[in-house]
Amino acid sequence: MEFFKKTALAALVMGFSGAALALPNITILATGGTIAGGGDSATKSNYTVGKVGVENLVNAVPQLKDIANVKGEQVVNIGSQDMNDNVWLTLAKKINTDCDKTDGFVITHGTDTMEETAYFLDLTVKCDKPVVMVGAMRPSTSMSADGPFNLYNAVVTAADKASANRGVLVVMNDTVLDGRDVTKTNTTDVATFKSVNYGPLGYIHNGKIDYQRTPARKHTSDTPFDVSKLNELPKVGIVYNYANASDLPAKALVDAGYDGIVSAGVGNGNLYKSVFDTLATAAKTGTAVVRSSRVPTGATTQDAEVDDAKYGFVASGTLNPQKARVLLQLALTQTKDPQQIQQIFNQY
């Protein structure tokens, strides 16, 4: 009888031990940026990006082992000012291919173009596991480096099943933001990332996420964008508008054979006359033209001062110019018809 009691007790203890060890598996895909940067001084802001590899990033946060089984992979190690279509396609394909091998993904990334990568992945990832992007505003050698705790919170988010089916997420400064709406709003502030039109999805406190809302637009598996067979993306450039603007940048993009042009307009996406005329001509000859705005909040609406249908233009809605460029690149893999492109902008 005593033998059976001891056996049962041992089985119970082993069961509890197994449950404690059953942590989620999280894959960290590292791309570089300030979070992987290093400098010569703990108190000065000068540093070099991409000096720290993914293994050192993970080892700098030993608390990660308490919340997940973490595996790191170095995709690239660059400043995000050098982010490009090839890395975007690599990330999307890798996540889609490895979706069944892990419980969630964390992507470490520079903050300069994080919002663009987040939106691209939000449109192209076909995985129902959490995908979380994270970075830092201060290098790893800074006295008050924000990267380690941001990384911890990102893994917390990726390990939480409640983070699934919310699109690609950005976690910075205790805040969870959605990949479509998030933007960088300050050059140096650690609280730089905000969803300026709709607010955050949630907040993180003491390792727990309090979700407030879900993304309103379609994302990930609910989009038609399949990059599995793509090796390059359509060429799309951005033209900036201002008082007495030159039309030379717009003409240069047209002459270079760009497939699409996004106008960073004034006000409600308005254009200086010479730029307007150049883009109207371009639209008639098959170049996709999207009107966005340099104004940080609000929407660029259809048919306000500009008759979009008449000129073959597309209104970007709440997408800023850099995000409108991302969606136009993907839209052009589906169609060149401006009316159909407008429908895509209305949905995603």
From Swiss-Prot:
Q: Which residues form the signal peptide?
A: 1-22
Residues reported to bind substrate: S80, Q81, T111, D112
Q: Keywords in alphabetical order, please.
A: Disulfide bond, Hydrolase, Periplasm, Pharmaceutical, Signal
Q: Which GO terms describe its biological process?
A: asparagine catabolic process; protein homotetramerization
Matching Pfam families, A to Z? Asparaginase, Asparaginase_C
- Assembly and binders: Homotetramer.
Which additional comment does the entry carry? Answer: E.coli contains two L-asparaginase isoenzymes: L-asparaginase I, a low-affinity enzyme located in the cytoplasm, and L-asparaginase II, a high-affinity secreted enzyme.
Query: What name is this protein filed under?
Result: L-asparaginase 2
